[in-house]
Amino acid sequence: MSKIKKFIKKKKKSKIVSLTAYSKNIASILDNYCDLILVGDSLGSVLYNYKSTREVNLSTMIEHSKSVRMGIKKSLMIVDMPHNTYRTPKEAVKNAKQIMKKTKCDGCLLYTSPSPRDNTGS
């Protein structure tokens, strides 16, 4: 059974544990306790003292994700896609493929806002 299928099966039965890592050493410690490890664009604020996560670029996320991947044996690894790397669907797919190929992550995370046309009335 794949890691993703195991994750989904576990999620249906119990709560999952997810934490953020930016390096191999931290990831190797967290791997024993987490179901999912996120490489967050928050590394800009935490490690580089950026005022905003919007200053983080794709190459920085890829390099940190490659480091984190080396510390993970069992957890899923998800990588934040930096701001302005998914302005169009085509750009999102291109950059997600690049992240996944170079880092061997299990998925990419991007943040969106509801479209004004998506008014659900709630």
Regions found by a protein language model. Give the residues of each.
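Glycine-enriched alpha-helix->loop->beta-strand junction motifs that scaffold or abut catalytic
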Residues: 33-36, 103-104
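Single conserved hydrophobic/aromatic residue that forms the stacking wall/gate
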Residues: 111-122
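Alpha-helix-loop-beta-strand connector modules within alpha/beta enzyme cores
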Residues: 53-79, 117
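Conserved, mostly hydrophobic/aromatic
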Residues: 23, 30, 68
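Hydrophobic faces of well-ordered beta-strands that scaffold small-molecule active sites
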Residues: 17-20, 37-39, 77-81, 108
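N-terminal amphipathic alpha-helix/helix-capping segment at the start of soluble metabolic enzymes
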Residues: 1-20
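Glycine-rich, proline-tolerant flexible connector loops at the mouths of alpha/beta enzymes
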Residues: 38-60, 83-86
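Glycine/small-residue-rich loop that forms an oxyanion/phosphate-binding "nest" at active or ligand-binding sites
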Residues: 74-105
